């Protein structure tokens, strides 16, 4: 038995554990901790900061900030996006604002120089278009998938950041209407998004989806085995 077959056999023997997110409970001075999951093929683990809930028509129901314990999320990835470092390279379903928000260019703080701003706008456009195209192709391959079609219908409205600002999830500068880079007010009044993101900025918020499809499947798209 070579080592590659041994890895395959071990994976198959533990298939019942694939995709399960379990936690080891707190005990004494030890805090609750995540047990590293056995990932499905072409999947990765990411910390999602915001959950957006839609109905099956792709209409926004609500959005919420994920507390630290509920952030770990198993997401599908492509061969390219699983190891992305720079440039536009979208995940297929759950991703950062740069990819899922069609109104990203309206709200991302602009680069100072004209040349950098031009490059920034090009990257933002390519990021969203790549995400939309991948999701569209997936939905075309699986036309009966209510969740995919709902997410696709919503992101095509290109109002995601606008909706999150209006819902009090994200915050914009009063003077520029671009995303507030840091919270400068009283720390006791710090909005949840800044507390969750820590040293990171709002542009780096990672989005996951719930769809109330009313078909008996879990609304959490990231917990649906069919996805």
Go through the PLM ranges and name each one.
Residues 1-227:
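Conserved phosphate-interacting/catalytic interface
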């Amino acid at each position: 038995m070579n080592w590659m077959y041994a890895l395959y056999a071990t994976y198959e023997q533990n298939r019942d554990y694939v995709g399960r997110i379990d936690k080891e409970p707190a005990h004494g001075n030890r805090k609750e901790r995540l047990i590293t999951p056995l990932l499905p093929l072409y999947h990765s683990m990411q910390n999602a900061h915001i959950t957006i809930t839609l109905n099956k028509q792709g209409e926004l129901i609500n959005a919420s900030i994920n507390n630290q314990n509920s952030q770990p999320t198993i997401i599908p990835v492509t061969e390219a996006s699983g190891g992305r470092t720079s440039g536009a390279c979208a995940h297929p379903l759950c991703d950062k604002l740069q990819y899922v928000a069609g109104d990203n260019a309206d709200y991302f703080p602009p680069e100072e120089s004209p040349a950098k701003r031009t490059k920034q706008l090009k990257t933002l456009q390519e990021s969203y278009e790549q995400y939309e195209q991948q999701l569209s192709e997936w939905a075309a391959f699986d036309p009966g998938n209510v969740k995919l079609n709902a997410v696709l219908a919503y992101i095509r409205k290109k109002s995601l950041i606008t909706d999150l600002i209006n819902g009090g999830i994200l915050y914009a500068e009063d003077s520029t209407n671009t995303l507030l880079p840091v919270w400068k007010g009283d720390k006791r009044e710090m909005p949840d998004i800044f507390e969750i993101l820590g040293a990171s900025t709002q542009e780096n918020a990672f989005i996951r989806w719930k769809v109330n499809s009313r078909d008996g499947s879990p609304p959490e798209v990231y917990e649906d085995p069919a996805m």
